[in-house]
Amino acid sequence: MDTKRIATLALASLLWLGWFYTLSSTIATPPVTALRWIPPRSTAFMDRERGGAVSWDWVPYDRISQNLKRAVVEAEDGEFFEHQGVDVDAARRAALHNWRKRKFSRGASTITMQLARNLYLSPAKSPWRKVREVLIALKLERELSKDRILEIYLNVAEWGRGIYGAEAAARHYFRKDAKDLGARESAFLAAILPRPRFYDKHRSGPYLNRRISKIEGML
């Protein structure tokens, strides 16, 4: 990496961190301690369905296929068990990308950050939402174990219009329980997480099939 690129990356990182800490002191975050023991009653994403049918069945961590747990971590956040809610290197790369593009298009969201967004925020991309997302993610990491964070995430993630959580997804796509998902099925569910509503209607294609095979190969 040349000197100019390093300097640009460092400047982008400093600007992002300065902006983040300036805003963070003014932002309130929801209480999350109760999530240690009590599943959420709903999520911000479920609430936006506005009266539409929602399929959601909570299942405990030990009733979710190990294949799915591994597939989702590999696909969405390979450093999940190492970081404290924010992948600093990924965030730095995203900040540089956004600075170059002069728009907020990449967010480097970890599983914990995605959980914060699903529970309390909206899918709209904005710097303001990203700051709240990071702050809530840091709070979740302080209050909950990694297994609990992953358990909640797998139970509230969206897998299609009105399809929330691993159990509903397993039944919707494969007519089976989440605990019985195989490697290929788990890789499919992990692969469609970035665009679940689109892939619910388009369940095959060259890109998706390559992504499924890549994730399956990691298991």
For the regions a language model picked out, list residue spans one by one.
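Juxtamembrane regions of bacterial inner-membrane/periplasmic proteins
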Residues: 2-219
